[in-house]
């Protein structure tokens, strides 16, 4: 029977397609889709439930209601398939054709498509060169448009009101034609000749910038119409397609009411108005009535296409705006994001998770009931195969009765069939992993404790979902790629993800600690077995120091896998000796012969992975886990209130602080300090005190006095439970212990400002009511913050994924030798990130040579692994040029060499790896750990910023960077006068050890090439004021320094001294803008000139400066002329955390941005205009570049200074666009990478640089055409980089002029929307705008990215899917060739047959 039914299945050939095209439908096209015209607004007959004929659900147009049965019931059954009933006109076929048969409505008057009218920029407006307002007035019958001026002076395209029209009609009669409504617009569009318009525009690309911009926009649209073969008048519709009825269903509810899709209401409105208009036209009704009806029809069509886009949205009976066709596809619940990108999955279940401590890493516990349900089909087929059940129905019964044989079969079916576990939210690829199921009783899924950190799961009620991979291919991929034991590293950083936490760490830590004078200290054992026996018999304790003979299995010199035993007597402790049993072969015991804190365990697992491989590591991790649980139980570590030791010095410290605060209050009352300073100082004092109490408490907790074997009292590390928990990294931190036993310290108000009275109590002593109340602020803000953070972080991840989703490794090597020079990241003299961390797992771009002997250490094109890094570190290499994804030349993808190591697997990245998505996940996943706040500099936050000196961390030789300039003052001290000076300390070989920024005005204590010892102070400065220093000697002459106009005298109330302060010009009496400044005169009274120029030395005083010299005083170089108190500077908010990362990736221009020098040259100041300073830079050719700078900006250059292109001339945060324009791609990448890393580093999150580089590559993927050459591009057009390179290659091959371009930096949202794939862009944001644009251009989506392929339901072109697509392409080419061959053969055979026939007939004739 089944075979018979298969015969009747309608065969649909497998459709292979390589691209999807979108366009505007012509009226003919719409009619060709249609199966009939919908003439009536009726839907279904409410009594018979049958669809009305010619209505919106008409069976004649759209197909039958029941399978193979016409409406009147004359033809039933399969045998009449394809018959059209003569009575009711319905074709006898399957009912599912009602999902794809369309109808149409012939509109009685043309209607404009609202998308092309209202979606900005208005396409209709661009084509017609009319304003949107004018077009709307014409369309909605408020004005006439002239379509044919005839012999009259009227202009075509001009607009006239009704009164104008009447006057002109009287004046000119029928000489001209002016129309109203969509007819007029359609007429104009029809008469438009694209070719002439394009030529006109191409020749008219001169004149003002605005005109050129406007013309190039129009040109782009016109070219698009011409290229795609779409006629502009199709933007006005004569025929409206009708959606198939099953896609806008009408469902009868009980009680005789109906639930209907909003579209039916909208269609009914259109049909009603259309029919009424047709009737009015037939009756030749008065113009005004017809006009109103036409307007209403246009509005109805607008609402159907995009409700609410113009005017008020149409509403249904319940005052709710109706969902139009546009609403169906856009937004989170639209077609794209709800149904195409997010589908529900069959064969899945979910349940609560619990711990499975006895599981192996690749296993999970699956409840029997769940497994039975999930694997049902497999069980049915086994039952049938074994002959226990003959039909599926019988098998069902068997399973439901739960006979023992069913459970046996379940065991069998489940064996070696991996299942996938997922925990929402799935923030990175480790959120879904495959496990082998183990059947368990109960109803909770059991999860291996080591994978918790990857899933971010805990057992406080979390739920997880189970999915069953069905096909053999799916099972294979789950096993080889997704099995938990194959994913032991985080793809974000390459750190191990299977690191034990909490009690396991505590157990291992306790067992590997040493105790002075422990039971059995100093004993010597022959092997581990003996140690175990001694422990069991309580002769030794687990923390005692002993010596034991151990055998280590080490890898031989030649690196082969034949491990050699090395036996020796080792000093260690009992616990460590016992743990040595589980050490994998190839690791020396020294890696374990220390107290195992969490970091150490992580390092241990990492070392094991690099040295012993994956399998050994997984086994080792499992054993560590078992040991950790067992030892933690044995240790019996508990927590008690007496473990929280409050230091005795606490009271004294607090009293001291209170006295200091009193002193400052006194100073404030006497007017020595301002209110702001008082607040800052008080907060500072309490902050310091809190830290001191914390320090004292920790030192008390962490040490304890014990008697050693010789009877002496010694300090040993404490065995205090709370200290051990924090020290091992199991739970808690120093800050939390400080709140338990130190003092809670300062609290913040809800607005983020710090309350200046701290909580001096701790939790052990208990808080009073006021203290408790103060601390509730912070706690609640924390909860509110978390909720906001999650949403924001999710949105950032979504944007990142969208911008990188089509970046896949598609070839092994692009052959470029470009790269980026990497060196250790040093800030404030401290190495923040070593060279090793930055280049590990990268591929060298050029040979790396030994700094002294110049021998080649690493060849170009080699991946730097751990062993190579040791060689480089030994040689002291401090800079390596490595390949990076930014300089990769691969088109439409990236190559493996430029990407480097796949961090999640530890080898060179495979072809087909979706590195873009991995980068996005790696940056997005820790997003929830970042803060949401913006920090105010002030109070506790600023303490880090106030350094007043800098000292050397290592011995070496002093050098200065190229921009460092200094003068010697009267005392013989060196005073820094450059803004970006840095001191560099190098070792004797000339390798950089550290570099320190020194601010303007600092006094240097060292000279160039001086050799110094670590700890020497290099320079010091006053952190609270910014000085203004003269570089030249001379006699001062003040200009514009007038009291009450530009300066005010401030008299200090206490000391009675007076100083001049420069005041803000906004508050001055006079309207004239003058800038107070000082000039220097030489002995002859002439103005001192800057050497080599004829500019006088002029030093301006900024607002808020305290002038330190008198008029007419003699000054020496390096002397301070004025000081600006830092307090007077506006405290800049630092954007931190998540908003900062988003700001960087969106490439937003910061507010109050710094300005960089556009050219290299000499600085001078021109004459001032309206509150702005004219800053000029003269380049070596003598060209002058000008920048107008508002007065209140802080200019960091001075007259006569030579600046390099891209150097900062005005203080403030850098604008990434400027960095790209002036300094290039590499500097930009460096800036973004460093800034993003700063944010994550603050939270202690490790992310590899390459992920951020991948995102930057995608932000730079479009270029702007600066000269089109012989290409078809338009000046200023933005094009995909890969596409442009392809075009240029073709042009060069034909000896034509290639197009030139400049780099463009787009923010991630912009970049996602401007991709070449319209499907991907439409499913991201602004669906309407993207589709409108794509339709006009007749865009073709090549389906290159992952998203497009998911949407159209193909395998994604990444991973195993990439191989599939490549194979398919190859097969298609083969097939084509084969077809040609076969065709040729057939032709030859046919010819031969003809010849034979002719020979035959000739023979017959002869006979």
From Swiss-Prot:
Keyword Ligase listed: no
The entry's keywords: DNA-directed RNA polymerase, Magnesium, Metal-binding, Nucleotidyltransferase, Transcription, Transferase, Zinc
Does the entry feature the keyword Transmembrane, yes or no?
no
GO BP term, pick one: DNA-templated transcription
Q: Record-annotated residues binding Zn(2+) 1?
A: 70, 72, 85, 88
Disulphide-bonded residues = none
Cofactor: how and how many bound: Binds 1 Mg(2+) ion per subunit.
InterPro entries found in the cross-reference section: DNA-dir_RpoC_beta_prime, DNA-dir_RpoC_beta_prime_bact, RNA_pol_asu, RNA_pol_N, RNA_pol_Rpb1_1, RNA_pol_Rpb1_3, RNA_pol_Rpb1_3_sf, RNA_pol_Rpb1_4
SUPFAM superfamilies noted in UniProt: beta and beta-prime subunits of DNA dependent RNA-polymerase
Describe, as the record does, how this protein assembles with itself and its partners: The RNAP catalytic core consists of 2 alpha, 1 beta, 1 beta' and 1 omega subunit. When a sigma factor is associated with the core the holoenzyme is formed, which can initiate transcription.
Question: What is the protein name given in its UniProt record?
Answer: DNA-directed RNA polymerase subunit beta'
State the species of origin: Leptothrix cholodnii (strain ATCC 51168 / LMG 8142 / SP-6) (Leptothrix discophora (strain SP-6))
- Gene name of the encoded protein: rpoC
């Amino acid at each position: 029977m089944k075979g018979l039914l298969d015969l009747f299945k309608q065969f649909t050939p497998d459709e292979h397609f390589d691209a999807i095209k979108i366009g505007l439908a012509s009226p003919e096209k719409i009619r060709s889709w249609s199966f009939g015209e919908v003439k009536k607004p009726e839907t279904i007959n409410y009594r018979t439930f049958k669809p009305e004929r010619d209505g919106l659900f008409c069976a004649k147009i759209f197909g039958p209601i029941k399978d193979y049965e016409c409406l009147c019931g004359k033809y039933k059954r399969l045998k009449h398939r394809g018959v059209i009933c003569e009575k009711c006109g319905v074709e006898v076929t399957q009912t599912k054709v009602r999902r794809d048969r369309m109808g149409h409505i012939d509109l009685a008057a043309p209607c404009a498509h609202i998308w092309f009218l209202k979606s900005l920029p208005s396409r209709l407006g661009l084509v017609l060169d009319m304003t949107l307002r004018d077009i709307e007035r014409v369309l909605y019958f408020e004005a006439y448009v002239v379509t044919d001026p005839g012999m009259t002076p009227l202009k075509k395209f001009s607009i006239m009101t009704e009164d104008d029209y009447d006057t002109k009609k009287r004046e000119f009669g029928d000489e001209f034609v002016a129309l109203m409504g969509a007819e007029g617009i359609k007429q104009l569009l029809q008469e438009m000749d694209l070719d002439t318009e394009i030529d006109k525009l191409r020749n008219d690309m001169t004149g003002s910038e605005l005109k050129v911009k406007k013309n190039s926009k129009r040109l782009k649209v016109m070219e698009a119409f011409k290229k795609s073969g779409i006629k502009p008048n199709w933007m006005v519709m004569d025929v409206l397609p009708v959606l198939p009825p099953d896609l806008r269903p009408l469902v009868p509810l009980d009680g005789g009411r109906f639930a209907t899709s909003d579209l039916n209401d909208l269609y009914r409105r259109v049909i009603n108005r259309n029919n009424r208009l047709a009737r009015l036209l037939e009756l030749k009704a008065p113009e005004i009535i017809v006009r109103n009806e036409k307007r209403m029809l246009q509005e109805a069509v607008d609402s159907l296409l995009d409700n609410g886009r113009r005017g008020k949205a149409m509403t249904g009976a319940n005052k709710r705006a109706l969902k139009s066709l546009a609403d169906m596809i856009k937004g989170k619940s639209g077609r794209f994001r709800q149904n195409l990108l997010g589908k529900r999955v069959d064969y899945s279940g979910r349940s609560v998770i619990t711990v499975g401590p006895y599981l192996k890493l690749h296993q999970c516990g699956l409840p029997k009931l769940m497994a039975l349900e999930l694997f049902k089909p497999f069980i049915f087929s086994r039952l049938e195969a074994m002959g226990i059940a003959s039909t599926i129905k019988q098998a069902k019964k068997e399973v439901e009765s739960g006979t023992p044989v069913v459970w046996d079969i379940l065991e069998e079916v489940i064996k070696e069939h991996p299942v996938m576990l997922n925990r929402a939210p799935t923030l990175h690829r480790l959120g879904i992993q495959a496990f082998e199921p183990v059947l368990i009783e109960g109803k909770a899924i059991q999860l291996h404790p080591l994978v918790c950190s990857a899933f971010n799961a805990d057992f406080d009620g979390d739920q997880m979902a189970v999915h069953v991979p069905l096909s053999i291919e799916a099972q294979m991929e789950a096993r080889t790629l997704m099995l938990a034991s194959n994913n032991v590293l985080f793809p974000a950083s390459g750190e191990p993800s299977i690191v034990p936490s909490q009690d396991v760490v505590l157990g291992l830590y306790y067992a590997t600690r040493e105790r002075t004078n422990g039971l059995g200290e100093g004993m010597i054992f022959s092997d581990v077995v003996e140690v175990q026996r001694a422990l069991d018999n309580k002769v030794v304790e687990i923390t005692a120091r002993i010596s034991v003979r151990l055998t280590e299995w080490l890898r031989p010199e030649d690196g082969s896998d034949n491990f050699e035993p090395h036996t020796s007597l080792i000093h260690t402790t009992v616990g460590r000796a016992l743990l040595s049993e589980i050490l994998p072969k190839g690791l020396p015991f020294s890696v374990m012969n220390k107290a195992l804190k969490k970091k150490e365990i992580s390092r241990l697992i990492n070392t094991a992975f690099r040295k012993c491989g994956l399998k050994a590591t997984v086994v080792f991790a499992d054993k560590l886990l078992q040991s950790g649980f067992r030892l933690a139980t044995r240790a019996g570590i508990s927590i008690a209130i007496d473990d929280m030791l409050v230091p005795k010095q606490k009271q004294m410290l607090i009293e001291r602080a209170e006295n200091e605060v009193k002193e400052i209050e006194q100073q404030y009352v006497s007017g020595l300090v301002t209110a702001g300073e008082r607040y800052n100082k008080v907060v500072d004092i309490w902050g310091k005190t809190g830290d001191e109490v914390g320090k004292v408490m920790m030192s008390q907790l962490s040490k304890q006095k014990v008697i050693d074997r010789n009877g002496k009292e010694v300090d040993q590390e404490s065995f205090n439970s709370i200290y051990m928990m924090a020290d091992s990294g199991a739970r808690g931190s120093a800050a939390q212990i400080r709140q338990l036993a130190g003092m809670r310290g300062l609290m913040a108000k809800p607005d983020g400002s710090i309350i200046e009275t701290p909580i001096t109590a701790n939790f052990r002593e208990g808080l009073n009511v006021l203290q408790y109340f103060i601390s509730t602020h912070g706690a609640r803000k924390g909860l509110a913050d978390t909720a906001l953070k999650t949403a924001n972080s999710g949105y950032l991840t979504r944007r990142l994924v969208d911008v990188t989703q089509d970046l896949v490794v598609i070839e092994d090597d692009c052959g470029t030798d470009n790269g980026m020079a990497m060196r250790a990241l040093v800030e404030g003299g401290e190495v923040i990130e070593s060279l090793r961390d930055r280049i590990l797992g990268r591929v060298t771009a050029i040979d790396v040579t030994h700094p002294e002997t110049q021998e080649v250490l690493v060849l170009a094109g080699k991946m730097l692994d751990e062993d190579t890094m040791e060689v480089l570190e030994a040689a002291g290499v401090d800079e390596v040029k490595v390949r990076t994804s930014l300089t990769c030349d691969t088109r439409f993808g990236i190559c493996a060499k430029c990407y480097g190591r796949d961090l999640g697997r530890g080898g060179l990245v495979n072809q087909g790896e979706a590195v873009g998505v991995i980068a996005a996940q790696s940056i997005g996943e820790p997003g929830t750990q970042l803060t949401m706040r913006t920090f105010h500099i002030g109070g506790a936050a600023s303490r880090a910023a106030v350094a007043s000196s800098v000292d050397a961390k290592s011995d070496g030789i002093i050098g200065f960077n190229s921009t460092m300039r200094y003068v010697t003052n009267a005392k013989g001290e060196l005073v820094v006068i450059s803004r970006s000076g840095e001191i560099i300390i190098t070792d004797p070989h000339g390798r950089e050890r550290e570099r320190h920024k020194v601010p303007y005005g600092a006094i240097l204590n060292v000279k160039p090439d001086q050799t110094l010892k670590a700890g020497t102070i290099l320079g010091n400065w006053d952190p609270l004021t910014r000085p203004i220093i003269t570089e030249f000697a001379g006699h001062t002459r003040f200009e514009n320094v007038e009291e009450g106009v530009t300066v005010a005298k401030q008299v200090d109330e206490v000391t009675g001294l007076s100083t001049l302060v420069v005041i803000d010009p906004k508050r001055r009496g006079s309207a004239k803008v003058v800038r107070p400044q000082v000039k220097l005169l030489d002995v002859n009274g002439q103005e001192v000139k800057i050497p080599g120029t004829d500019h006088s030395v002029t030093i301006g005083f900024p607002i808020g400066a305290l002038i330190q010299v008198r008029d007419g005083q003699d000054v020496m170089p390096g002397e301070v002329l004025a000081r600006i108190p830092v307090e007077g500077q506006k405290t800049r908010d630092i954007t931190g955390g998540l908003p900062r990362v988003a700001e960087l990736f969106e490439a937003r221009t910061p507010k109050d941005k710094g300005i960089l020098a556009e050219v290299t040259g000499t600085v001078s100041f021109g004459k001032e205009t309206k509150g702005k300073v004219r800053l000029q830079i003269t380049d070596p050719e003598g060209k002058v570049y000008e920048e107008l700078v508002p007065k209140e900006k802080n200019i960091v250059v001075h007259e006569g200074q030579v600046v390099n292109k891209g150097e900062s001339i005005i203080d403030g945060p850098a604008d990434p666009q400027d960095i790209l324009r002036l300094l290039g791609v590499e500097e930009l990448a460096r800036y973004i990478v460093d800034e993003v890393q700063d944010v994550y580093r603050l939270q202690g999150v490790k992310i590899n640089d390459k992920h951020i580089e991948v995102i930057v590559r995608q932000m730079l993927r479009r270029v702007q055409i600066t000269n089109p050459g012989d290409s078809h591009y338009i000046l200023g057009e933005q094009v995909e980089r890969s596409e442009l390179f392809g075009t240029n290659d073709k042009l060069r091959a034909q000896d034509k002029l290639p197009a030139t371009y400049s780099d463009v930096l787009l923010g991630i949202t912009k970049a996602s929307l401007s991709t070449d794939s319209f499907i991907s862009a439409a499913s991201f944001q602004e669906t309407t705008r993207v589709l409108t644009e794509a339709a006009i251009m007749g865009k073709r989506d090549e389906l290159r990215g992952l998203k497009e392929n998911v949407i159209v339901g193909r395998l994604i072109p990444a991973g195993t899917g990439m191989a599939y697509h490549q194979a398919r392409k190859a097969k298609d080419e083969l097939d084509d060739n084969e077809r040609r061959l076969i065709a040729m053969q057939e032709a030859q055979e046919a010819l031969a047959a003809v010849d034979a026939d002719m020979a035959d007939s000739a023979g017959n004739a002869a006979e």
